[in-house]
């Protein structure tokens, strides 16, 4: 197969991030300079974001049998790049107080971003697996980056071992699917499934094992047990990446698989997914109720958010409405999570041992950092799905899709889950306005709003509010990103 200039333009984000990895690697080898390597990483990610405009001009195309570049791939690539960019900006002040090697952090984030972009473009089970491994392997190192703390090291070991087990399930599932259908590309799988092959036991077993592997990566119940521990143990900027880029990229590729290969047409698979969605929504919210650690709380809340998204995935037969729901919901989830984890990162910067993640650290924050407290409040309201925030628009879409496809008990679960979620999100928001303790523990720097991380947090808050009141620009972008079959 010959690679044309058009193909190269379509792969620009991937090539730019790949080139940035090489440049940062050479820069580290030449001379360790934290500021220089952080700047190079941010420039590379920004250049990749800008290149999406040129990709859009080139139009949709298949680049090699493994990848398809279209509006859908561009939307998810953009979201992954934004999350990676935010991770780098939050990491810079955090690493300022870190005594070991700082520069490799950016290298690992860039490699993980590469995996995310590959997943967004994947059109084949081989590229799906490659992308998942490319995003997971750097995360093993990132989660354990604060390795002098027992908790970070423990989180890294836990995530590594469980992730390896999940990958083996995924790979074995793919092997069974290949044994039955003789093909691994999404489109060919779709054709085979259309020929009434979906009820073959081998194929069902294969897809079942793949659901186990992907369920782990998306932290869906009952494959979620690693989530709160890893979120708590990982450095705050890494938790940001875990909660956003990795989830968004993997959910995007699952969405494309379900679009091309209508796996959801099988009654057995639909029932299994519905049970997983129901359990994730209810369990994630119930477990978050008792948490006094903000990172653990956000970990459990991410389980419930993926449960809500699964409702839209099950309702994929409604076509465009369901895909629109996922796009809008993921954008809202991205900005809300970036803001919430960004505040935790700012409070924990520079690195001085464990992060400022206990609820007590935020008590009375309003009285000495009013803007930061306001940002955190907006993020909590958005995650809870309160009207006038972007989180509400996403949740409304999910409910509309559920009602349209008559998934009544899942719609009920979304409503009950949102009601439970309201309690623990408001608990965090209210504690920001209580009397400050006599001896405040950790605090954000006084000039936090002038730092790159502070600007990212403020922009996230602004987007959550503006798009919550006027979501049309976001909806238009998501509509442009419908994959052309």
Swiss-Prot record:
Its EC number is 7.1.1.-. It comes from the Bacteria. The chain crosses the membrane at residues 8-28, 35-55, 71-91, 105-125, 127-147, 159-179, 203-223, 235-255, 271-291, 297-317, 326-346, 373-393, 408-430, 455-475. It is found in: Cell inner membrane. InterPro entries: NADH-Q_OxRdtase_suN/2, ND/Mrp_TM. The keyword Glycoprotein does not apply. Pfam families: Proton_antipo_M (PF00361). GO terms for cellular component: plasma membrane. GO terms for biological process: ATP synthesis coupled electron transport. Belongs to the complex I subunit 2 family. NDH-1 is composed of 13 different subunits. Subunits NuoA, H, J, K, L, M, N constitute the membrane sector of the complex. This is NADH-quinone oxidoreductase subunit N. The lineage of its organism: Bacteria, Pseudomonadati, Pseudomonadota, Gammaproteobacteria, Enterobacterales.
């Amino acid at each position: 197969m010959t690679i044309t200039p058009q193909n190269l333009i379509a792969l620009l984000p991937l090539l730019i991030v790949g080139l940035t990895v090489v440049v940062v690697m050479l820069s580290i080898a030449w001379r360790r300079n934290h500021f220089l390597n952080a700047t190079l990483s941010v420039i590379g990610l920004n250049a990749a974001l800008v290149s999406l405009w040129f990709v859009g001009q080139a139009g949709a195309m298949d680049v090699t049998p493994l990848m398809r570049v279209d509006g859908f791939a561009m939307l998810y690539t953009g979201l992954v790049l934004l999350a990676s960019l935010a991770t780098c900006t939050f990491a810079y002040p955090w690493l300022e107080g870190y005594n070991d090697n700082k520069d490799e952090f950016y290298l690992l984030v860039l490699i993980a971003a590469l995996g995310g972009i590959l997943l967004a473009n994947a059109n084949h089970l081989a590229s799906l697996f490659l992308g998942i491994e490319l995003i997971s392997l750097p995360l093993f190192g990132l989660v354990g980056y604060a390795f002098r703390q027992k908790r970070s090291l423990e989180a890294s070991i836990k995530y590594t071992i469980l992730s390896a087990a999940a990958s083996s399930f995924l790979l074995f599932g793919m092997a069974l699917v290949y044994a039955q259908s003789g093909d691994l590309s999404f489109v060919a799988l779709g054709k085979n499934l259309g020929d009434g092959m979906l009820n073959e036991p081998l194929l069902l077993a294969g897809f079942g094992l793949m659901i186990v592997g992907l369920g782990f990566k998306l932290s869906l119940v009952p494959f979620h047990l690693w989530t709160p521990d890893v979120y708590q143990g990982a450095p705050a900027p890494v938790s940001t990446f875990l909660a956003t880029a990795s989830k968004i990229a993997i959910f995007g590729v699952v969405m494309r698989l379900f679009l091309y290969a209508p796996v959801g047409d099988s009654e057995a698979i639909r029932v299994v997914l519905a049970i997983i969605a129901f359990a994730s929504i209810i369990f994630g919210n119930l477990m978050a109720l008792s948490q006094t650690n903000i990172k653990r709380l956000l970990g459990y809340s991410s389980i419930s958010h993926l449960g809500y998204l699964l409702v839209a995935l099950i309702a994929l037969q409604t076509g465009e409405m369901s895909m629109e729901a996922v796009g809008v919901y993921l954008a809202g989830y991205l900005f809300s999570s970036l803001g919430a984890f960004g505040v935790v990162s700012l409070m924990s910067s520079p690195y001085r041992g464990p992060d400022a993640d206990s609820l007590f650290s935020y008590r009375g924050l309003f009285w000495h950092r009013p803007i930061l407290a306001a940002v955190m409040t907006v993020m909590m309201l958005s995650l809870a799905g309160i009207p006038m925030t972007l989180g509400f628009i996403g949740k409304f879409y999910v409910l509309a899709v559920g009602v349209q496809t008559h998934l009544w008990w899942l719609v009920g679960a979304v409503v009950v889950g949102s009601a439970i979620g309201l309690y623990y999100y408001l608990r965090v928001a209210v504690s920001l306005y209580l009397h400050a303790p006599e001896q405040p523990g950790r605090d954000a720097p006084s000039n936090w709003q002038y730092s790159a991380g502070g600007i990212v947090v403020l922009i996230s808050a602004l987007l959550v509010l503006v798009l919550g009141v006027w979501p049309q620009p976001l909806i238009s972008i998501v509509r442009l990103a419908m994959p052309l079959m």
